[in-house]
Amino acid sequence: MANNFITNAQQRSLKDRIQLLIKYSQELKFLVGFFYFSGWRELYESLKARNDIKLKILVGLDTDLHLGKVFEIDDPKAIHSSQQELVGRFFASLRIALKDESLDTQEFYEQVDFFLNLLEEGRLQIRKTFDPNHAKLYLFLLDSEGQSLVNAPGRFITGSSNLTRSGLLGQNEFNVEIGDYGWE
């Protein structure tokens, strides 16, 4: 029986699995509570290698800057805010987080440029949930080669990992990959 559990321990990191699935995917859809640029950085090379891939990210919480570190917050004002206000606050908090000095490197600027190009080309969409949401779900719609390898139109991973460096490889997590359910 195949081991579908991904724990970030002993050569079973979510980063490695997502990178492999990106190689065989035509579209990615991620629902995450936290979206740090540290997670984007971990997937950058894999995404850059696919000039045709589309990515949709739905973020359930905001980002903010605290003591020189990026972290996410559950905004209590969200209950009384319009979708436009939520999106505005999310991108404002992202701008603050991106001004952190630890991100002031040439590599980071190249990654941001790639990120912005994906947005401009319509290959990347980032949206904010109306209500706070801490769920984690990674959907992979496979290309024809990927479908023939796993005999399924897609795969999904759900569990505890956010789209952060820690969630992708830095700390113990528990995720499960499923491919035989929910694709019809």
Q: Where are the language model's segments positioned?
A:
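PLD/PLD-like phosphodiesterase catalytic module centered on the HKD motif
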Residues: M1-E184
